[in-house]
Amino acid sequence: MCLQILEQETKKHELWIEELEKKQQLAEKKPELRKEYEKSYKKYQNLLKKQDHLMRVGVYLLLNLAEDSKVEIKMKNKNIIELLVKMMKRQNMELLILVVSFLKKLSIFKENKDQMKEMEVMEKAAQLIPSQNDDLLNIALRLILNLTFDTEMRDKAVKSGLIPKLVDLISLEHHSVVVTCILYHISMDDKYRSYFSYTDCIPLVRYFKVLFFVSWIFSNHFH
């Protein structure tokens, strides 16, 4: 039931956006319709706040229910990943944190990761880096870390411009370990090591040589 409500709300939001864009285009052609568009936009903003709250509660409930692996599999079969990916476009921080947390939880399984690959989750996660919200930044980095266990996902990470973004974050103590692990993953591919020469990351690349403990960190802290 909760999943169905979220699906309905997602479709409803898509219709709101479509209608709003039409009114905006008309207002651009006919200035006399500008006030009507502004009125519709304010109405949309109010509806959006209410919908964000409803979705936040829904995702929170599903995330907790997914602690049961059997329930999680049922959600997967009902396209929970596709629904969550659509919600990555939302602007509400609390909702985004829950959505990315859910994706991070699901991303430890290869079949889920493959689906996320098709839905460009890496590209969408890269857009969240950096974030002024520290909790969102933290969970987005952990999602990216899980995804970069896959070679193709590492390609997507580089093509999304993540390397310089990650290098800028490495000085933040509370994110440095996760960031270092992601960069370590990327550096395992010879073709991408040269990318680090265009950053302030040369000492870090050298440091990777002594990061043999990193596999232990992965298995004990990030899955």
Spans of features found by a protein language model:
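Long amphipathic alpha-helical tracts in eukaryotic proteins
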Residues: 1-223
